[in-house]
Regions:
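Short, flexible hinge/linker loops that cap or flank conserved catalytic cores
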Residues: 2-3, 122
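Glycine-rich active-site loop/strand segments that organize a redox cofactor
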Residues: 30, 34, 41-82
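N-terminal Rossmann-like FAD-binding beta1-loop-alpha1 element of flavoenzymes
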Residues: 3-33
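A conserved short coil-to-beta-strand element within the FAD-binding core of flavoproteins
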Residues: 98-113
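Helical element adjacent to the flavin cofactor pocket in flavoenzyme catalytic cores
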Residues: 79-96, 100-102
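Short loop/edge segments at beta-strand edges and connector loops
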Residues: 96-100, 118, 132
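Short hydrophobic core segments
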Residues: 9-11, 116, 122-135
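Conserved Rossmann-like nucleotide-cofactor binding loop
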Residues: 16, 38-39, 135
């Protein structure tokens, strides 16, 4: 079985994982983002139906992408936030793989880096970023 090699592995494809992906790309760092479900899954399936963003649309956004179809002073509904995060991942061309669960992360013994077990096989990474859970 071959082991995939990456410089930096980002675990999680939500707000934090996408923000990290953008910064790594801007710095020229080769990386891969793994998301066990779909982008922004928790916004879709683990939030109250009535949830809205905690700030107005003009504020709660990433650089270079406005919320569409909403007044800038309005508060985006959870589905709108999830759709926005998908659009942002596409905009920045995030190198993301959805449907891949990370099961174990271990430090390499005697050399730098990490050995990461996933639902699709092994990955060795120099750096691992945990971007799971709330932003």
């Amino acid at each position: 079985m071959s082991i995939e090699q990456v410089d930096t592995l980002v675990v999680g494809g939500g707000q934090a994982g996408l923000a990290m992906s953008e910064h790594l790309s801007n710095c020229g760092v080769s990386h891969l983002v793994l998301e066990r479900h779909q982008i922004a899954e928790r916004w879709r399936s683990e939030r109250w139906d009535s949830l809205v963003a905690n700030g107005p649309a003009w504020h709660d956004r990433f650089p270079g992408l406005e919320f569409s179809e909403i007044d800038p002073d309005a508060f985006a509904h959870k589905e709108m936030v999830a759709d926005y995060l998908v659009a942002y991942a596409e905009k920045i061309a995030a190198p993301i793989r959805c449907g891949v669960a990370v099961t174990t992360v271990q430090s390499n013994i005697g050399r730098p880096g990490f050995r990461v077990e996933t639902s699709e096989g092994l990955i060795e990474a120099v750096n691992v970023v945990a971007a799971t859970g709330p932003f």
